[in-house]
Each structure stands twice: as structure tokens, then as C-alpha cells.
Amino acid sequence: MYKKIKLRDQQISELINLESKRQNSQIELIASENYASEDVILANGTSLSNKYGEGYPGKRYYGGCTFIDQIEKIAIERVKKLFKIEYANVQPYSGSSANAAVFAALLKPGDKILGLDLNAGGHLSHGYKINFSGMFYSGISYFLDENELLDYDAIEKIALKTKPNLIICGYSAYSRKIDFARFRQIADKVNAFLLADIAHIAGLIAAGQHPSPVGYAHIITSTTQKTLRGPRGGLILTNSKEIAAKIDKVVFPGIQGGPFFHTIAAKAVAFKEALEPWFKEYCAQIVKNASHFASEFIKKGIRIVSQGTENHLFTIDVLSSYNLNGKQAQILLESVNIITNKNTIPNDTLSPFVTSGLRLGTPAMTSRGFKEQEFSQMAEIIDFVLRKKELNALEIKEIKKKVKILTKNFPIKKSYWP
């Protein structure tokens, strides 16, 4: 379990401890959240946060960089080994800033970006109009087919018609495997760069639980906190020396200043953990758990987007299945200490603030040791809560008791830790 901390600032100390208590005592099913190891958290809260060091190892604009240079080099070498790739930049502050760096390095303002429609599982930074990617570049969308799967022939037709400069594959709510080789064929036909945004599935790729984009995508971006279980941060990978040089120039001095060396150290620790044999076992269990979890709902007649999952997440169409919107479902479940997030579904008729879907993921609770049996229990509880719609005081008490037993039996430091 995450330990209590004591600061001189009692107000902040109390709030941090309350948040740690919340994490310890609730079921976490948000697909983009996970539990970093104590080593990662410790590395992220060290004196390294005091150090400034604009530039790259051996080429800094500040003195006193002997040790931070070594740390950044180690992080780079570890992540290159993890993904079997030639070049890596570990300085991006987030996944979105990593994407911004790629766009700035490879595109001109107004160039065309082709990405999955946001409602269908795309991401804001893939060309959505209210995001920088849609403000400074021309965002074009592709969609899922009638089975809610990627239709590569249809994507190719859109690409041939619109001639994008960059095609993005990699999503925030798509539950099926991605054919990176097919995407590269499409990109080559229109002379476009192919960007694989693997923020959600990076850990699964590293562990061999999802096909790798290495060798197909010109460039790869990721976060480090989701299935990789590292600190909050970004990452850029490529096998192209030319692209790597452009990326380095854009990350610094183009869009960022001094790197967060405390975070880079924590990334290095997470990369080392992901290279351990137990991490492959952990990611395999994530996928098993997600498949089993989704199947439990399908058995109950609940509609799952694309009728299943091959990765770590899936989305329930709560509007058609329970006559609830995603916001209502999220609030209901939080009232019994089960944390989820509302999510749009393909062709959603409701706003992103309401949604027709509820996204569920297995990485965090798999970190705590949940296996198929526990996810069967979760499906029973969630289905009961959403069917009832309104819970009385006794029902809330009983469900909270069940959740408490599960969180007590599976504390944060229960399984799959170094």
C-alpha cells in the first residue's frame, strides 16, 4: 500500500494522504490508470527535481550535469532495448507533448493529419478541432465499420482521396489489435508519415501481448504511465536517424525547456521493471482479465463495442444496455467505490460530457493481483448496480462491503511487483 507521508504543509499532506487512502480503498477500472511501483514513485520525488539541464547528455547549457547525463543515457538505452529500436527521446513531458513534437518536426502548419474519429476511440491530439492538433493542422477522420472494427480498405480510400501528410494509428478506446503493416501500406501509397501512438498499449507491446509497430511506423509516441506503469510522462521512438535528429531539435529547444530529470529517472526505473520476466506475465494477465471481464457482460446480454476485446480495455454501450448515459453510470458506480469513466462510442448521439458508453480497463486491478475470478465478481456487481439504477442505503452498504473485502484482500502492493 502507498504509505502516509508527513509534510510541514499539513493541508497538502492531508490531501495527499486522503488521495492515497482513496486509491487503496477503491476499485480502479479506468483503462488509462495504473499503480506505479514504490521505486518509480520514490525516483520521481527526489532531489533531481532541483536540477536544470537544457539540452541532451554531453550537450547541456548548464554545468553540474554529470549524473543527470548518466541517468538520461540509462533511460534511453533501457527503452531502446525494451522496444528493440534505434533511437529514443525520453524528455517529452506527456503523450500530447510527444505528439506535438512529432507534428512540429514532420509537418508544416495546415498539413493534413488522418486519425480515427474521436467518438470511435481516437484522441484529442490526433487532429481534433478544439485541440492544438486541429487548430494548427487540418484534421481528417476515418471511422470504424458496421462491426465497430477498423476497415483498412475504407481507410485507404479516405487516404487516397484526401492525401494526408501524416496518418495516425493508436487509440484511447479501441479494443482490438492494430494491423500496423497494413497501415504502413496505406501510408506508403500516399507518401505520408505513419505515426503509431501506443500510449495505451505500450506495455502490452513491450511484453509481446500486442503486435509491435517497430519496423512499420516511421515514428512512435507513447505515455509512460499506463500499461508501462511508469511516471506520468511521454516518449518518442524511431528507427530513422534523420527523423530522430528532427525530433531532438523540436523537443529542445523547439517546444520544451529543461527536462524533468526526476521523471526521467522514474521512467528509467519503470523501463527496467518492464524488462523483467514478471512483466510479461503481468501483461498477459491484463489481456486474459479483460477478455474474461468483457465476456461476462456479453453473457448477460450487455452490448460491448466491437463485441469483445483483444487488449486491456472495452467499452459498454450503457445507453442501449441499461438505459443510462455514461455519466450516470460513472456516478452510480463511484457511489459504491468503483471508479470508471464515461466514454463516447462510435456514432454517439450524446455529447462527450454525457456519452453513451462506459470504458472499463484491467491494468490497475491486475497490478493488485486480480485474476478472472475477481473480474467475474466485478461484472456481477457492476451489472447489478447499473440494472438497479437507484440503490437504497442497505444495497449501497452491502456493495461497499464487498468492495472493501476485495481491496483489503488485494492491496496495491499485492502482486506483479519487482
From Swiss-Prot:
GO (cellular component) term, any one: cytosol
Top-rank lineage group of the source organism: Bacteria
Molecular functions per Gene Ontology: glycine hydroxymethyltransferase activity; pyridoxal phosphate binding
Enzyme class, broadest EC rank: transferase
Keywords linked to the UniProt accession: Cytoplasm, One-carbon metabolism, Pyridoxal phosphate, Transferase
Chief localisation class: cytoplasm
EC number(s) stated in the UniProt entry for this protein: 2.1.2.1
InterPro entries according to UniProt: PyrdxlP-dep_Trfase (IPR015424), PyrdxlP-dep_Trfase_major (IPR015421), PyrdxlP-dep_Trfase_small (IPR015422), Ser_HO-MeTrfase (IPR001085), Ser_HO-MeTrfase-like (IPR049943), Ser_HO-MeTrfase_PLP_BS (IPR019798), SHMT-like_dom (IPR039429)
One matching Pfam family: SHMT
Cofactor or coenzyme needed: pyridoxal 5'-phosphate
Entry's localization field: Cytoplasm
Pathway assignment: One-carbon metabolism; tetrahydrofolate interconversion
KW Membrane (keyword) present: no
Catalytic activity: (6R)-5,10-methylene-5,6,7,8-tetrahydrofolate + glycine + H2O = (6S)-5,6,7,8-tetrahydrofolate + L-serine
Similarity remark: Belongs to the SHMT family.
Subunit structure, interactors included: Homodimer.
Function recorded in the entry: Catalyzes the reversible interconversion of serine and glycine with tetrahydrofolate (THF) serving as the one-carbon carrier. This reaction serves as the major source of one-carbon groups required for the biosynthesis of purines, thymidylate, methionine, and other important biomolecules.
UniProt-recorded name of the protein: Probable serine hydroxymethyltransferase
Species of the source: Mesomycoplasma hyopneumoniae (strain 232)
Gene name of this polypeptide: glyA
